[in-house]
Amino acid sequence: MDQSNRYADLSLKEEDLIAGGRHILVAYKMKPKAGHGYLEAAAHFAAESSTGTNVEVSTTDEFTKGVDALVYLIDEATEEMRIAFPMDLFDRNILDGRMMIVSFLTLVIGNNQGMGDIQHAKIYDFFMPPRAIQLFDGPSKDISDMWRILGRPVKDGGYIAGTIIKPKLGLRPEPFAQAAYQFWLGGDFIKNDEPQGNQTFAPMNKVMPLVHDAMKRAMDETGEAKLFSANITADDHYEMLARGDYILRTFGPDADKVAFLVDGYVGGPGMITTARRAFPNQYLHYHRAGHGAVTSPSAKRGYDAYVLAKMSRLQGASGIHVGTMGYGKMEGTHDDRAIAYIIERDSYTGPAYHQEWYGMKPTTPIISGGMNALRLPGFFENLGHGNVINTSGGGAYGHIDSPAAGATSLRQAYECWKAKADPIEWAKEHPEFARAFASFPGDADMLFPGWRDKLASHR
């Protein structure tokens, strides 16, 4: 059934829809299956994503038609399809009237992903009008809160050197806490790896007191504050809350130094919102394990990593992993810096839409996946700043001297970039950074050919 007369209006102007402030706009790359016209398929897609079904139904009235989603732009050659969704379509909380990401996802990327006439459809950007921005929670904490704890300026406080406890699984409580202590002697921030929680060989009620003790010892020894991101992800919201409450009790007066890590993709949006609302005084660390199933460029359905990051800010994530922008082991390109810019700035023009955030707190880009001191200067140069959290697991624990030396080398890499120094020359005066060359010789050979001869007299 051709529904283009009802669910498409190509005379609509995007600038008018934005100025009106009554629609959420979504940009897709969509391809129909063979034998289906582009506009016909696009209109069917909009119908399935809003008020329509596969036949005309007698219960439809004029009000219903007033909240139809409308295709307003198509370009078959580039697979471009843009749809305007009336704000009234989206579900609201009965408790406080606020919007929810689950409703957004249900409509814009729900049943339409299994339609028989669609080869593929993937969201690459969306626009939220001012009223929608007001109706999402947004972050309660941001990187400025971390800088404040670390004793830094709350504006441009700079790089937070972090790690992930490695190996990701298999450490019992005492070795786990010792690994944390060793890194904290040189670094700022430690996070649980996403599978770490309450394994039988490392129960949380034994691990967390030891980690707090390690934190206190490291703070006493270095005179610096330390930060820990504890994984509270669970299937059950009550279990997640119980974990969070236990951790806060355990850390006691140092609870402000604890972030809560939630695996937001596998756990779902409800886990992020529950953590945001139950623990507004904690930094909310959004881990995105599994996201590549839909965000990878090789995946033709779902949504891009840019879209995931943008949604995370609406939900209230204080920080989210954004990959390594082609500088680490994770899939990505240098242009992925746009993922960082959309969540950290108050205004940004993305691949399809300009988005204003109207003062919503920023979400911190968290950099992780194959990064070490040698890769960081180029990363910072591409991003244009160092106001990020970086969690380097192998980059710290793989340092030839010690995890503390690995942490120090990460800090020195940031200082090298800030000073606009040549990394080889910088290494001659910074021993931990210099030893990173020997620790990661494959990277050193790739990034700094001839480094062995240049550093030979400074070993």
UniProtKB/Swiss-Prot annotation:
Superkingdom of the organism of origin: Bacteria
Family: Belongs to the RuBisCO large chain family. Type II subfamily.
Any GO MF annotation of the entry: monooxygenase activity
Further facts: The basic functional RuBisCO is composed of a large chain homodimer in a 'head-to-tail' conformation. In contrast to form I RuBisCO, the form II RuBisCO are composed solely of large subunits.
GO process annotations (BP): reductive pentose-phosphate cycle
Keywords: Calvin cycle, Carbon dioxide fixation, Lyase, Magnesium, Metal-binding, Monooxygenase, Oxidoreductase
Function, as annotated: RuBisCO catalyzes two reactions: the carboxylation of D-ribulose 1,5-bisphosphate, the primary event in carbon dioxide fixation, as well as the oxidative fragmentation of the pentose substrate. Both reactions occur simultaneously and in competition at the same active site.
List of catalytic residues: K166 (proton acceptor), H287 (proton acceptor)
Name of encoding gene: cbbM
Cofactor: record remark: Binds 1 Mg(2+) ion per subunit.
Catalyzed reactions per annotation: 2 (2R)-3-phosphoglycerate + 2 H(+) = D-ribulose 1,5-bisphosphate + CO2 + H2O; D-ribulose 1,5-bisphosphate + O2 = 2-phosphoglycolate + (2R)-3-phosphoglycerate + 2 H(+)
Species assigned in the record: Polaromonas naphthalenivorans (strain CJ2)
Binding site for Mg(2+): K191, D193, E194
Descriptive protein name: Ribulose bisphosphate carboxylase
Subunit description: Homodimer.
Matches recorded under CDD domains: RuBisCO_large_II
Swiss-Prot/TrEMBL cofactor(s): Mg(2+)
Any Pfam family hit: RuBisCO_large
Residues recorded as bearing N6-carboxylysine in the entry: K191
Binding site for substrate: N111, K168, R288, H321, S368
Record EC number: 4.1.1.39
